[in-house]
């Protein structure tokens, strides 16, 4: 655990709530995902409601947990096999959940398809601030190697943009602390 050096110092902890999912909602421009965030809904509960076709107040803890796994897993290219292993459900059920997810959040699917196509053509992807991640294996003939590069193509703009935003916030906080002569 971190502790302040002495009584003259205080530790500051800050967190952006669901930053990566907010970024994917923004860059994919998916209406359903944007609506959930804009209305202050819990994105995992909203996803469970959409995927399972039930009202938000009917979502169980297990359904929310499953939706949370799907929300984060989709960004990292989770397969039906991987989802079935994580959720301990049959592979067919996992495939149905992934299919329903993309039906309810088509903007996310479009983002993924367009990002892979861009990466194949240009050999890189970018964060929202233009920082590039080069993907030398994006056109590999080896399917396993290519799939890994494709997953990186999809998640690098999301994770990288998140990192960019957090670093900017840290710089702004540091400047404000110096300005106010705080330690």
Regions found by a protein language model. Give the residues of each.
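Conserved catalytic core of nucleotide polymerization and phosphodiester-bond processing enzymes
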Residues: 1-183
């Amino acid at each position: 655990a971190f502790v302040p050096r002495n009584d003259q110092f205080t530790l500051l902890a800050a967190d952006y709530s669901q930053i990566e999912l907010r970024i994917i909602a923004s860059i994919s421009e998916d209406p359903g995902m944007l609506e959930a965030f804009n209305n202050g809904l819990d994105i995992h509960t909203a996803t469970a409601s959409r995927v399972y076709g039930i009202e938000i107040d009917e979502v169980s803890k297990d359904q929310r947990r499953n939706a949370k796994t799907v929300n984060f897993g989709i960004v990292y290219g989770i397969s039906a096999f991987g989802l079935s292993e994580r959720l301990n459900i049959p592979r067919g059920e996992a495939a149905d959940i992934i299919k329903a997810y993309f039906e309810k959040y088509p903007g996310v699917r479009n983002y993924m398809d367009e990002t892979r196509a861009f990466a194949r053509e240009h050999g890189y992807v970018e964060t929202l601030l233009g920082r590039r991640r080069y993907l030398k294996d994006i056109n590999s003939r080896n399917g396993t190697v290519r799939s890994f590069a494709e997953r990186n193509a999809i998640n690098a703009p999301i994770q990288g943009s998140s990192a960019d935003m957090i670093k900017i916030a840290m710089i702004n906080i540091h400047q404000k602390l110096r300005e106010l002569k705080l330690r």
